Swiss-Prot record:
Domain of life: Bacteria
Keywords for the protein's UniProt record, in alphabetical order: Plasmid, Signal
InterPro entries assigned: Adhesion_dom_sf (IPR008966), AfaD (IPR008394), Dr_adhesin_sf (IPR037028)
Family, similarity comment: To E.coli AggB.
The protein's name: Protein AfaD
Chain segments carrying region Disordered: 91-111
Signal peptide: 1-26
CDD domains recorded: AfaD-like (cd18776)
Organism: Escherichia coli
């Protein structure tokens, strides 16, 4: 196998369908890996791009990762390599997204009534990444008005 192929960082992302409990409002999530060749990631480099779709009435979107948060920061995470020996620091965000505020907040949110919006998973700081497979999962919800 070619050495440069072995050095490629693979990020495995799953597509998830999250349903908010007690509400008929469902959020569809689609995630596409941006992969990469080489072992250096610059701060802000896109690791994956996602799309959240809310087909029913809503006032915003909420996206989070199911990974270890960095220093309690809502939008920053550490992803372990499949073998558990290496780490990749990432953050979620993009145009119009803001970290969820408050203690215990997780992820980013964005106001809006569009049917779908895009978000990014980006490198958090300049990093030298060990070759390997880095898996992570992303969750999402449609924000509905309180009655």
């Amino acid at each position: 196998m070619n050495g440069s192929i072995r050095k490629m960082m693979r990020v495995t992302c799953g597509m998830l369908l999250m349903v908010m409990s007690g509400v008929s409002q469902a959020a569809e999530l689609h995630l596409e890996s941006r992969g990469g060749s080489g072992t250096q990631l610059r701060d802000g480099a896109k690791v994956a791009t996602g799309r959240i779709i809310c087909r029913e009435a809503h006032t915003g979107f909420h996206v989070w990762m199911n990974e270890r948060q960095v220093d309690g920061r809502a939008e920053r995470y550490v992803v372990q390599s499949k073998d558990g020996r290496h780490e990749l620091r990432v953050r979620t965000g993009g145009d119009g997204w803001s970290p969820v505020k408050g203690e215990g907040g997780k992820g980013v949110s964005r106001p809006g009534q569009e049917e779908q919006v895009f978000f990014d998973v980006m490198a958090d700081g300049n990093q030298d990444i060990a070759p390997g497979e880095y898996r992570f999962s992303v969750g999402g919800a449609c924000v509905v008005p309180q009655e």
